[in-house]
UniProtKB/Swiss-Prot annotation:
Localization per record: Cytoplasm
CDD domains from the UniProt entry: FBPase
Keywords for the protein's UniProt record, in alphabetical order: Carbohydrate metabolism, Cytoplasm, Hydrolase, Magnesium, Metal-binding
Name the UniProt record assigns to this protein: Fructose-1,6-bisphosphatase class 1 1
Cofactor(s) it depends on: Mg(2+)
UniProt lineage: Bacteria, Pseudomonadati, Pseudomonadota, Betaproteobacteria, Burkholderiales
Organism: Cupriavidus metallidurans (strain ATCC 43123 / DSM 2839 / NBRC 102507 / CH34)
Amino acid sequence: MTRISLTRYLVEEQRKHNTIEPELRLLIEVVARACKAISNAVSKGALAGVLGSAGTGNVQGETQQKLDVIANEVLLDANEWGGHLAAMASEEMDSFYEIPNRYPKGEYLLLFDPLDGSSNIDVNVSIGTIFSVLHMHKPGQTVTEHDFMQPGTQQVAAGYAVYGPQTTLVLTVGNGVHMFTLDREAGSFVLTQSDVMIPEDTKEFAINMSNMRHWAPPVRRYIDECLAGDEGPRGKNFNMRWIASMVADVHRILTRGGVFMYPWDKREPEKPGKLRLMYEANPMAFLVEQAGGAATNGQQRILDVEPTKLHQRVSVILGSKNEVERVTRYHQEDAAKA
């Protein structure tokens, strides 16, 4: 059977649907190459001296790991000179990075979390890179933060690479979700699963149970019902999974279903959530919806949230459609009582 490379897939998608512009195809290929380089760095670990803290912090106030910094630099260096981008934004940078004048500029904006789940780096658990692509409002003009302030519905592509037992690139350009596995011998990503679909129902949930006492009542209600199992109102037993790496948890959900929850909690009531809207929640919500799932912040569809700042946070509930709709309904019922 003929193996389909990422490049061939993108070319054939353009022929079939006429939705992938040549510049977007080249941009996705550059991001994929950067993910290969990050995968190589991750796989070397202690051999290359890349484990441990970098001794610095990011704009979120989080301690940066050495691989956080390395992955961020790899993505910047790979993408700044190709002529496809006007600017980039990253979890690891205070502000956006405008393409220098010495390079040609394109009409796309690239946003990324260079290494999601970095608390897992030193313990050798799956981590990943998340990315999102937007169109510039007005190509050719000076980039401002306002150009990035687009709802998730405006994404033209999104994906992630998960660095685990295999390195897998998961991608959508608005025509379903497709998975590509890195063939290290050939040095290329090969299509290994097409048109991924998330089951509408599930018996698995992913949440950090240690935070239960801080959750809002709708989230506690949902989890309490899951924990009650076949003796409770749901009439079935649930399993809990939690990897503390959004990429790994979402990859499991895309593979076999489930619901992922990182909700608001009362420790920081002024913050609507922990995860970042622009380069974590939006790309993952795009992927999940393209795979037949749903993604909400409890009150509204994540892709409809209007961003107001680059590092905006949001509550995230995503995965199997019927479970996400149930949690959303619980939030609506709770709001109606207030």
